[in-house]
Regions:
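Ribokinase/PfkB-type carbohydrate-kinase core domain
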Residues: 2-16, 78-91, 105-223
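Structured beta->alpha junctions
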Residues: 42, 64-67, 93, 143, ...
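Short acidic/glycine-enriched loop/turn segments that link adjacent beta-strands
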Residues: 95-97
Length: 223
């Protein structure tokens, strides 16, 4: 029987996604257009992973930040409905909850994003003392050379000081560097998540499958 307080500890981004489908063009200045539907969801890779874990019947905790506003309240309610412990979720009095507007049509998508409380995200804020109370930690927000050293230091500390297994969702490298140093992290990762494009870039291989096989030689599992 698992004696840990939480099944999964997640730190990272949470925001509101407002999705507006069927947008073929934007209104001219001074004009107004109507849309048939506009939908609101909880977004952010870390938050979505946490919600998914909660819906599977596990007991996750989420550490992040929202604003003291209606969207922050919506997020907290969604977490509670999905059996997510929000005791580590900070409510900011300074910044508003992040919002991403998604304009979609059959051909493409465009986004407008206000980062809001997600501006404060930094992997150095992960509370290793809290991680000790979890069976597993899910890590997101890697940005290549921008925060590589911080990630390496954290993963080493987690392996040395806790019993938690580690999953790592790499994400897109906004710097465009795709540096091979990411492999330094793999020995400390039990489950490595990458999409096909990310795997091909980081693996410098012709196929994601070939890259995944190579990654799995040092990481526990590449998905």
């Amino acid at each position: 029987m698992n004696a840990k307080k939480w099944d999964v500890y997640v730190y990272g981004d949470v925001n509101i996604d407002i999705v507006i489908p069927g947008v073929e063009k934007f209104p001219e200045p001074g004009q107004e257009d109507e849309v048939s539907v506009m939908e609101t969801f909880v977004g952010g890779g870390a938050a979505l992973f946490t919600l998914g874990v909660g819906k599977l019947g596990l007991h996750p905790v989420f550490q992040g930040e929202v604003g003291d506003d209606c969207y922050g309240e919506l997020i907290r309610n969604k977490f509670r409905e999905s059996h997510v412990d929000d005791s580590l979720l900070v409510v900011s009095k300074e910044l508003k909850t992040g919002i991403s507007l998604s304009f979609t049509n059959e051909k493409d998508r465009s986004f407008l994003t206000y980062r809001g409380t997600n501006e404060k995200i930094s992997i150095v804020n992960v509370d290793v003392e809290k991680v000790k109370e979890a069976a597993h930690i899910h890590v997101t927000g890697y940005a290549g050379s921008i925060n590589h050293n911080e990630y390496l230091e954290l993963l080493k500390k987690i392996k040395a000081e806790t019993q938690a297994t580690v999953s790592f969702d790499v994400g897109w490298d906004s710097t465009g560097e795709w540096k091979p140093e990411i492999r330094d992290l793999f020995p400390y990762i039990d489950v490595l998540f990458m999409n096909e494009t990310e795997a091909e870039h980081y693996g410098r291989k012709e196929s994601a499958e070939e890259a995944a096989r190579e990654f799995a030689r040092t990481a526990g599992m590449a998905v």
